[in-house]
Amino acid sequence: MEETTIPFKSLHSREYQGHKKKVHSVAWNSNGTKLASGSVDQTARIWNIEPHGHSKAKDLELKGHTDSVDQLCWDPKHSDLVATASGDKSVRLWDARSGKCTQQVELSGENINITYKPDGTHVAVGNRDDELTILDVRKFKPLHRRKFNYEVNEIAWNMPGDFFFLTTGLGTVEVLSYPSLKPLDTLTAHTAGCYCIAIDPKGRYFAVGSADSLVSLWDISDMLCLRTFTKLEWPVRTISFNYSGEYIASASEDLFIDIANVQTGRTVHQIPCRAAMNSVEWNPKYNLLAYAGDDKNPKYNTDEGVFRIFGFESS
């Protein structure tokens, strides 16, 4: 596929309103038909998105958390189950059809990161106290708990589920074997803290975003850095590979989202935004990029509570 085959320049963003405060996290379900958004307003919402359809989306509110919903993720094997991590110390599992909470567990601290194992059996949760908890999805009970003596940020499994990655405030990526959680490797990735990590859906690469404003691309088989993406000037808060693994989106406090070609490192498009971004995520089936940030209403200086999706042929 040539770089020029996706006409990014002619594609549009649509705005989705519903939250009362800013949106911290956006995530697509496994078949790309639903998007979940988590907000400081203590709710998550489920949106049915038609990739080629009109922009009127009916949404479903998930209520129950008593603090900010900081991150959420969908069960990779079930397109109607979504897990939310909140500052209220709980993790909840929801049915996106009914909007009901089906499972919940109270953990020891304010939860800020959550990710599913690719086979859907386990969920990893990270909190503000640098503690990692692995939950068994069936029983929704902790299997492992591990406290680290350094800042732990975003976490991820590789596709086969035998490696577990931690990004750290030391500028390293810790690679642990799974399920033993024994250290395998420490990758000196950046000159400042590493904040976010994304796994290429084809399983070849992972990417790391850092406070040094760079995104690094790594070969997952030999753990070597292949290249860096240098367009952003502020700490990188969020990154995502598109479904084919050809493009990577990255965002920060810069007022644009960078979309780069993974193979060449070249920027192919930039999406202008009005505020620092908290979350970007590509749809797993289509070139639709959901993004959410600290948007304010300019008149009242209040949170707008919106997110947007880029990639539609009409606005």
UniProtKB/Swiss-Prot annotation:
Gene: THO3
Database matches in Pfam families: Beta-prop_THOC3
Subunit note: Component of the THO complex, which is composed of THO1, THO2, THO3, THO5, THO6 and THO7.
UniProt keyword list: mRNA processing, mRNA splicing, mRNA transport, Nucleus, Repeat, RNA-binding, RNA-mediated gene silencing, Transport, WD repeat
GO MF annotations, alphabetized: RNA binding
InterPro entries documented for this protein: G-protein_beta_WD-40_rep, Tex1/THOC3, WD40/YVTN_repeat-like_dom_sf, WD40_repeat_CS, WD40_repeat_dom_sf, WD40_rpt
Described purpose of this protein according to its UniProt entry: Acts as a component of the THO subcomplex of the TREX complex which is thought to couple mRNA transcription, processing and nuclear export. Contributes to the integrity of the endogenous trans-acting small interfering RNA (ta-siRNA) pathway. May process or transport a long RNA molecule so that it can be a template for secondary siRNA production. May participate in the trafficking of siRNA precursors to the ARGONAUTE catalytic center. Required for the generation of functional messenger ribonucleoproteins (mRNPs).
Organism: Arabidopsis thaliana (Mouse-ear cress)
An annotated GO BP: mRNA processing
Major localisation: nucleus
Family the entry assigns: Belongs to the THOC3 family.
A GO cellular-component term linked to this record: THO complex
Protein's UniProt keywords contain RNA-binding: yes
UniProt-listed Gene3D superfamilies: YVTN repeat-like/Quinoprotein amine dehydrogenase
WD repeat spans: 18-57, 64-104, 106-145, 189-228, 231-270, 272-311
Entries under CDD domains matching the protein: WD40
Consequences of knocking out this gene: Developmental defects as well as reduced levels of endogenous trans-acting small interfering RNA (ta-siRNA).
Designated name of the protein: THO complex subunit 3
Subcellular location as annotated: Nucleus
